[in-house]
Amino acid sequence: MEILLDMISGQSSELYKRLFDGKLINNSFGFEYFTGFGYSCVLFAGESNDPKKVAEEIVGEIGRFRETGFDETAFERTKKKLYGRMIMGMNDIEGLANNMAVSYFAGEDVFTDFEIFKTVTLDDVNDIFKKTLDKNRSVLSVINPN
């Protein structure tokens, strides 16, 4: 899922560049993916003076990718970038210890993610894309500072 979300809205994506250059977002913009027993959730978050416009742009970008699909070269580049980020995360002792604890309590091996990540294909990403990011199951939540 992280590969999919990074291709759509990561810092090197067309969407991010367009929103940032248009001053609709700042560098706090990003995404998260949550999952648990019986649920999952994608969250796009950040600061904006026009959150409705940002939401419209995100929905529009998802729609464009539904029509055009994802480029194999962009997929491979994103996959390598995120794999490298996973490896760099191993240099952080506190983060590694946290990941090991989370994996242990989930009954998993912290290094299994590396093996799984290496086997992900563009077809896998397209399959999950077909099942997720439905605009009819989305909501915009805005927290005003006042």
Specify the residue positions occupied by each region the protein language model found.
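Residue-level detector of functional hotspots within protein domains
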Residues: 5, 15, 28-30, 56, ...
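C-terminal regions of mature proteins
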Residues: 79-146
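M16/insulysin-pitrilysin zinc metalloprotease superfamily fold
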Residues: 10-11, 33-89
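Non-catalytic beta-strand/loop surface segments
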Residues: 6-53, 115-137, 145-146
